[in-house]
Design a protein with these regions (language model features):
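Alpha/beta-hydrolase active-site loop
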Residues: 1-12
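Alpha/beta-hydrolase fold nucleophile elbow
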Residues: 14-24
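Short glycine-enriched nucleophile-adjacent loop
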Residues: 28-39
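Active-site nucleophile loop of the alpha/beta-hydrolase fold
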Residues: 45-55
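Mobile cap/lid helix-loop segments that gate and shape the active-site cleft of serine hydrolases
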Residues: 54-90, 96
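Short beta-strand/loop motif that positions the catalytic acidic residue
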Residues: 94, 100-102, 106
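Conserved alpha/beta-hydrolase "acid-adjacent" motif
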Residues: 107-113
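C-terminal catalytic histidine-bearing segment of alpha/beta-hydrolase fold enzymes
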Residues: 115-155
Length: 155
């Protein structure tokens, strides 16, 4: 993502003061990581984003072998690697306005992850909005949410 931002700066047709980012699920995790590493994003929207890799490991038994392989070990073996990938551990470093959506019954990424992140964002007085609604569909958005995103990005 950061290389794409570098490319955008070289293009005359891109308003580099108004680059927004949108991520769903693991893409949400990547959005959080980009916001931590780079300040060029104007606003970001995250839907059902992974915010706590250790919690994700604990809650998703079906993903444990994949996470262990990708990260190189378990949370017990490599706590710093899981923390490095978890926005809840460094929410104080996020300085980009965030619009976060999460469904209450998401069975892929627990709403507890979003709640935990929002608690840290609030504690650190960050600029965010948090929208939850009843649904068990991972990454679900309602028509009204799409309109909210459009308006929010334009302000």
């Amino acid at each position: 993502m950061i290389h794409l931002l570098d490319l955008c700066e070289k293009l005359n047709s891109v308003d580099t003061k108004n680059i927004n980012m949108f991520g769903v699920s693991r893409g949400g995790m990547m959005t959080y990581e980009t916001l931590r590493e780079d300040r060029r994003i104007h606003k970001a929207v995250v839907v059902a984003g992974v915010a706590d890799c250790t919690m994700n490991y604990e809650e998703r038994e079906d993903m444990r072998s994949l996470l262990t392989e990708l990260i190189g070990g378990t949370p017990e073996q490599l706590p710093e690697e899981y923390s490095r990938r978890s926005a809840v551990a460094w929410a104080d470093e996020i300085n980009t306005p965030l619009l976060i959506f999460h469904t209450t019954e998401d069975d892929k990424v627990s709403i507890k992850q979003a709640d935990k992140l929002v608690k840290q964002l609030k504690k650190n007085q960050k600029d965010y909005e948090y929208v939850t609604f009843e649904s068990n569909i991972h990454g679900d958005l309602r028509k009204t949410d799409v309109e909210k995103i459009r308006k929010w990005l334009q302000t």
